């Protein structure tokens, strides 16, 4: 019995180690996503570079050190809003099942899917969770999952059929945690959970356990620790081989499958039937794959474990990664980051040149200063409306002259126009898709054709996301359909 407990503990730790490894392997994905998010929402001068001494510094700080103010013309945000807006204007949910329609409406999936598409454009990933909400009378609930709280093994299949381990990090109150792990009706288990989370050694236990599993960086901190006053729980789903018994009850003409560990129950039932001379239950040993869920504390405690309770027999997540060429994830917005940076540099340069150029400088010959006037008088009268300055030409013929220079005529505007045009070409989001008329003379048919052409350029993005929504609805149907 002791060896069995040790084996179970070793297996649980091995699974948690695999989950942590999957989390670490996604560190680059989270880093790139955070950079893409910063650019999309206007924080576009945070990329690191070096100063003249080789010290790391942000591009914005470096620009300020040269006396210029870094400016941002956020074209990426408008691009993303246009793509999401086009999606929302074309949403069509043709659902023939009344129960599914009610769930879709209750969960406000139009809003959820729009935000999921925005995440998909920014990070190349979108994840939703379809599950029963035990905090709301087991109502069927759909939620978007934050990529920063999600982990999965390295997958190559765009359908994610090669998923082997998947999970989510949760920050919960103590009451929520007790209900999530199925201890709400078990006072002893609830007290045990309260004890392991609320004692003076909790922080020390987290450090010791996470260090044993190799945690030694900031990414590790995000996995094991919360950023608020709640309690961290780690939900891990794995696909495992399991011994089963395929059973045929010849008395009731039913066919069912049970875990091999329940063989003694069948044996007892068959013994009773032999005495009554009734048909027995015939069995056949077999191996099958099952999805199993485990909940862990950050101190390594196994809080709960169970086989998938859903009719579809898998985990509750629906995910899509794009495009998964050689397993790589590349988002829609990352293609235009270089153009966005160049546009920002150009408008910063133009602003600096305009600020430093001569604007209305007055050249007034010293010998032409009228008698009784000071230079302050000349300055005041020159800037006043209808001002008059008496002036007597001298022998040199010099007259006052005001100078205004067009110092921006250095090709900067032309370069800016080129970059903005390239931005449209690379992204596929043209002016028509943004609702802008390129010419007043353009006809409605031509304008619609431009929109259709732009939509074709984005067709792969839209179709991939619609496949994700279809997978989500199929998972919903498999839960609510009768067995």
Q: Where do the PLM segments sit?
A:
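Extended, helix-rich architectural segments
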Residues: 1-291, 295-298, 358, 411, ...
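Long amphipathic alpha-helical segments
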Residues: 69-98, 128, 132, 151-154, ...
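His/Asp/Glu-rich acidic catalytic environments and adjacent acidic regulatory segments
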Residues: 336
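Conserved short S/T/G-enriched processing/targeting/catalytic segments and their helical context
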Residues: 340
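Juxtamembrane/interface segments at transmembrane-helix termini
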Residues: 361-362
């Amino acid at each position: 019995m002791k060896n069995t407990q040790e084996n179970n503990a070793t297996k649980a730790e091995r699974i948690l180690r695999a989950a942590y490894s999957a989390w670490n392997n996604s560190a680059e994905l989270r880093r790139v996503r955070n950079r893409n998010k910063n650019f999309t929402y206007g924080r576009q001068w945070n990329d690191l570079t070096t100063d003249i001494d080789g010290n790391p510094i942000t591009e914005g700080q470096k620009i300020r050190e040269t006396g210029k103010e870094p400016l941002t013309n956020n074209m990426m945000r408008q691009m993303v809003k246009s793509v999401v807006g086009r999606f929302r204007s074309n949403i069509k949910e043709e659902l023939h099942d009344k129960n599914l329609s009610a769930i879709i409406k209750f969960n406000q999936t139009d809003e959820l899917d729009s935000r999921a598409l925005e995440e998909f454009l920014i990070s190349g990933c979108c994840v939703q969770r379809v599950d029963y909400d035990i905090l709301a009378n087991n109502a069927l609930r759909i939620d978007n999952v934050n990529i920063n709280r999600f982990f999965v093994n390295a997958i190559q299949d765009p359908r994610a059929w090669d998923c082997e381990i998947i999970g989510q990090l949760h920050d919960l109150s103590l009451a929520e945690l007790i209900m999530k792990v199925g201890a709400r009706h078990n006072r002893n288990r609830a007290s045990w959970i309260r004890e392991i989370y609320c004692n003076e050694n909790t922080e020390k236990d987290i450090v010791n356990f996470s260090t044993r599993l190799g945690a030694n960086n900031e990414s590790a901190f995000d996995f094991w620790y919360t950023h608020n006053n709640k309690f961290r729980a780690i939900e891990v789903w794995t696909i495992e081989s399991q011994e089963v018994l395929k059973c045929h009850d010849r008395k009731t003409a039913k066919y069912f499958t049970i875990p091999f560990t329940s063989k003694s129950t069948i044996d007892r039932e068959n013994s009773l039937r032999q005495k009554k001379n009734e048909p027995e239950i015939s069995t056949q040993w077999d191996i099958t794959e099952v999805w199993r869920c485990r909940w862990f504390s950050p101190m390594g405690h196994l809080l709960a474990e169970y086989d998938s309770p859903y009719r579809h027999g898998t985990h509750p997540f629906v995910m899509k990664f794009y495009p998964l060429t050689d397993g790589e994830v590349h988002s829609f917005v990352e293609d235009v980051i270089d153009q966005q940076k160049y546009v920002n540099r150009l408008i910063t340069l133009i602003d600096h040149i305009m600020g430093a150029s001569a604007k209305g400088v007055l050249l007034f010959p010293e010998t032409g200063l009228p008698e009784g006037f000071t230079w302050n008088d000349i300055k005041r009268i020159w800037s006043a409306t209808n001002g008059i300055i008496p002036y007597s030409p001298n022998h040199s013929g010099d007259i006052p002259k005001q100078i205004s220079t067009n110092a921006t005529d250095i090709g900067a505007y032309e370069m800016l126009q080129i970059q903005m045009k390239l931005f449209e070409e690379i992204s596929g989001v043209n002016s028509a898709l943004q609702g802008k008329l390129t010419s007043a003379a353009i006809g409605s048919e031509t304008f619609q054709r431009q929109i259709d052409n732009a939509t074709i350029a984005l067709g792969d993005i839209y179709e991939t996301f619609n496949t994700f929504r279809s997978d989500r609805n199929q998972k919903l149907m498999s839960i609510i359909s009768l067995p």
